[in-house]
Amino acid sequence: MNIFDHYRQRYEAAKDEEFTLQEFLTICRQDRSAYANAAERLLMAIGEPNMVDTALEPRLSRLFSNRVVARYPAFEEFYGMEDAIEQIVSYLKHAAQGLEEKKQILYLLGPVGGGKSSLAERLKALMQRVPIYVLSANGERSPVNDHPLCLFNPQEDAQILEKEFGIPHRYLGTIMSPWAAKRLHEFGGDITKFRVVKVWPSILEQIAIAKTEPGDENNQDISALVGKVDIRKLEHHAQNDPDAYGYSGALCRANQGIMEFVEMFKAPIKVLHPLLTATQEGNYNGTEGISALPFNGIILAHSNESEWVTFRNNKNNEAFLDRVYIVKVPYCLRISEEIKIYEKLLNHSELVHAPCAPGTLETLSRFSILSRLKEPENSSI
């Protein structure tokens, strides 16, 4: 197979597939990923770990206190980060079960150059491996990735769906977006006129994966997260019409997926308010007089320690502190793992074939790690 055939085959495999609502419900009976939440799908993409019994190796036994450590092939290039990755997977497992973590922001905290951004990029790349199912009407896909199950009422329809299609009660309850509600009225309540599209999350096309960054404090507003009215559409629609709204916010695009907030605590506090209701209640308000928008995904944030300390010490931010799940991403403190990091960096540069004296990388690693070590307080050593 040449490169052109290989590319075409990959493109064809990633094309959207369309189903009727009845066909989608039949798929749910056979494939639980069709109704799984974002954390469950990310766990499927990460896969099973290789378990390492550190008691069998003297060096590792002292570092990990004889624990059995999980090493995930999906993160094999992240050296010396076993604890951080295990905490992320623990967060995802609990969020997948519908526990309190589902309502919290996953926050990577660590020093500059510790690997937070690389971890975030890998999580977003993994999110692309499992498809999502999105409502469609009149050939137009939902702009906020409405899941087909949002059409059903948890009080009225849950028992029938569980009995006929094996869909657990807890997967119902996500609200319908204003876009879907308008189409439902147009169809006269006939939900069979909706179609369901199987799409693959994409970083490139911002499908179920979005990224936002703090802007200038004077001109950044919440529209970066929740979207705003598209003035080009006001010629044809009223200002409070769902079709006049531009669903361009990061929360709109990241529904059913993952939203990355870079340097979150550098953003003005007013910009962060939609995150509270999006995580706690699964919905948030837009900037105009339309009904609430749904959010059923993961919010991933990261910043350096100095911003976190400043934010934590401000008493006005207590509401956020309770809704943050902190994963510490410290510097690597193992020489063997630090050498692997240098080798990885060299392999991705032109210096891979440059001559290097024996022991150079080991000396650099020792020096770097010694510069990171601090004398512990209350130590007898």
Feature names for model-found ranges:
Residues A34-I381:
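Conserved ASCE/P-loop NTPase catalytic core
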Residues M1-V52, G113:
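N-terminal accessory segments that target, anchor, or regulate ATP-driven/P-loop NTPase machines
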